[in-house]
């Protein structure tokens, strides 16, 4: 039963970092205010979302661009009509492109999070131009684009993906519950020969503008001070 909650339909193709983001978002969204539906690829496992989503739908979503994308667009459009969400939230470049096409003309707010622009990946100039063109066209069919760093927003502006007022920076959160166990930290200090009284900071991620290592350095300094 909906009970006047805001209904969000998430669409995701890529697992990995995108899935970790989605799981944490679903974990901390107020379930009294939000109803969550997840439409995802075969890379996701339904049992991992017990208690996190109200509905779980799995469809064929391939990473590579191909003829099957047309089928995916049709399936996503059917599911959007079925659930009639208030918000459609597309995660990552591939799901973002086909979801925005699938949602054309439907009455909801469409939000897209690239989780790192495809045109910033290491690829040929031809592919980079294609990815940029796709993002520019698809940007016409959503209400907001979430950028996970200031660098990602600036990259969109540099490529003229859309108007600045369509871009919103929302930094990724950290699920501190995963790091509250002091025992694991002590083991790592021992394994790495780190003194017990040493102040330790760390970052997991590529050293690239998309991961905003500059933000981490500033944050680490503030924590230490």
Q: Model-found features: residue ranges?
A:
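N-terminal strand-loop element at the rim of the active site
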Residues: 6-72, 151-155, 160, 166-169
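Active-site proximal beta-strand in glycosyltransferases
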Residues: 7-9, 104-120, 135, 146
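Conserved donor-binding loops in enzymes that form glycosidic bonds
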Residues: 12-15, 172-173, 203-209
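A conserved mid-protein helix/loop that constitutes part of the nucleotide-sugar donor-binding site
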Residues: 19-24, 199, 203-222
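Nucleotide-sugar donor phosphate/pyrophosphate-binding loop at the beta->alpha transition
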Residues: 67-74, 109-111, 119-141, 154-158
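A short helix/loop element that forms part of the nucleotide-sugar donor recognition site in Leloir-type
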Residues: 75, 180-194
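Short His-centered aromatic/hydrophobic patch
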Residues: 90-96, 114
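A short, active-site helix/loop in glycosyltransferases that binds the activated sugar's phosphate group
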Residues: 141-166, 174-178
């Amino acid at each position: 039963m909906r009970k006047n909650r805001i209904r969000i339909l998430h669409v995701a193709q890529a697992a990995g970092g995108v899935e970790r983001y989605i799981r944490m978002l679903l974990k901390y969204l107020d379930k009294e205010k939000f109803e969550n539906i997840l439409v995802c690829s075969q890379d996701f496992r339904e049992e991992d979302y017990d208690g996190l989503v109200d509905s779980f739908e799995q469809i064929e979503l391939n990473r590579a661009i191909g003829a099957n994308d047309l089928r995916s667009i049709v399936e996503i459009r059917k599911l959007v009509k079925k659930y009639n969400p208030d918000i459609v939230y597309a995660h990552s470049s591939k799901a973002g492109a086909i979801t925005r096409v699938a949602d054309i003309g439907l009455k909801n707010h469409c939000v897209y999070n690239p989780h790192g622009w495809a045109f910033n990946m290491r690829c040929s100039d031809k592919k980079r131009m294609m990815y940029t063109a796709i993002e520019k066209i698809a940007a016409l069919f959503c209400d907001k684009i979430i950028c996970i760093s200031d660098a990602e927003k600036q990259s969109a502006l540099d490529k003229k993906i859309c108007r600045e007022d369509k871009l919103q920076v929302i930094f990724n959160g950290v699920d501190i519950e995963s790091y509250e166990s002091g025992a694991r930290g002590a083991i790592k200090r021992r394994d790495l020969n780190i003194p017990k009284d040493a102040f330790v900071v760390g970052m997991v991620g590529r050293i690239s503008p998309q991961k905003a290592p500059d933000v981490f350095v500033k944050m680490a300094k503030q924590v230490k001070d």
